[in-house]
Amino acid sequence: MCNYFPKRANCAHISRCRAQYIVAINISIRVSRGAKLNSVELRKLQMTGGASYTVSLPKDWVKEQGLKVGDVVAIMPRSDSSLTLIPHEKIPTGKNRGAEVTVSPPKEQDKEQILRTVLAQYLAGYDIIRVRFPASAKPDLRTYLREAARKMFVGSEIIEESKDELIVQCLSSYGDLPAPKVISRMSLIAKLMLRDAVDSLKGRDPALAEEIIRRDEEVDRFYLFIIRQLTMAVLNRSLILEIGLADPRDCLVYRVVSKSLERIADHATTIAKMSASIENPLPPRLVDEISKASDITISVLEDSLKALAKSDGTLANKSIASAESVEREAENVMDKLFTFKLSPKSTVAVRLALESLKRISEYSEDVAEMAINLTARRTELY
C-alpha cells in the first residue's frame, strides 16, 4: 500500500521518463511546490486527453507490487487530503485474508497463559490460529482452549483438532457485523443488565443475577471482536469504511466507547453478585433511596448512548451534568446505611453496589464525551 500525498514537484524530467507508469485520476488534486523528502515520492500533476489528470507512479513501488501495464489499482481519497493507492488484487475484502499464525507454548506455561497468547493473536487480526501442544500437555488443555475460543471469539470455529494441535478459524466478515452495530448491541445488553441488576438488588433475585452474569460474557465477546476490527482498521485504512466508520479518527472514539460499555457491564455484574450476598429483604425506605440513585444512573447511561448515536452534543452535556448527581445520591445513601441496621455482610454488599453505580455513571460520562467529540468532527471545516 502506498499513501500518496498530492504535491507539486519541480521534476520536469518525470514526463520524459518512459519507465514510469501513469494512472488516470478523474478527480481534482491539491498540489504545492517541494522536493523529495525522506520516503515521500513527489510527482508532477499532468493532464491527458484534455479532461483526465494523471500522475506517474514510482518505478520501485510498481516493481515491488509486481504490477505491469494494464493492471488495475484502487485509489481511495482520504479526509486528510491524501490518497491511498492499493493494487486491486491486494484490497482486503473482510473475508478470510488467509493470515495465519502458529502458537507453540512452552511446557511451563499454564492454560491461562496459553489462552492469553491465543487471544492476543485473535485481537491482532489473524484468521487462522494454530496451537501446537507440547508432548506433556494434558487432554483438558485442548478442551479448555476449545471452549474458551467458542465462548470468546465471534464467528470462530474449531476446524481441526488432534492430540498435538488445535486450529481455530475466524470466519466472520467485518462487513457482516460493522462497528456501529457492535456498539449498538453492546449498548442494548449493558442497559438491560443495569436495569436487571438494580431490580435484583432491590428484590434479591438470585436467578436474575445469574442471567446478568451470563450476559456479561456476551458483552465481552463483542468487546473483543470490535477491538480486533479496530486493530485491523488502524493497520489497513481501506477497512475503515468496511467496518462502518467514516473517519480513521473514529477508531479512537469506538475504542473508548467499547471499553466503557465493557466496564459498565462488569459493574452491572458486580451489582448482581452483591444482591446475592444480601441476607434479608432490604427495608422499603432503603429500596427507595437506592432507586433514586439507580434511576439517575440509568438515565445518564441512556442519554449518553442516545447522544452518541445521534452525535447530539447538547444531550451529551446534559448527561455529563446529571452524572454528578449520581455520586451525591450514592454518597447520601452510604451515609445513612448504618441507620437501617443491616447485617455487616448486607451492609458491605449494598455499599459495593452503590460504588458500582457511581462507576457506571463515570463510564457513561466517558461515552458522552466521545459523543461531543464526534459532534465537533461532524461540523469541522476542511
Label for each model-derived stretch:
Residues 26-47:
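Extreme N-terminal segment that seeds HTH/winged-HTH DNA-binding domains in transcriptional regulators
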Residues 40-45, 50-52, 56-382:
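Cytosolic, long alpha-helical scaffolding segments
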Residues 9-12, 19, 23-24, 31:
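Acidic, Ala/Val/Gly-enriched low-complexity intrinsically disordered segments
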Residues 3, 7-10, 26, 36:
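Intrinsically disordered, low-complexity polyampholyte segments enriched for Lys and acidic residues
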Residues 3-4, 23, 254, 272:
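Compositionally biased low-complexity segments, especially N-terminal hydrophobic helices
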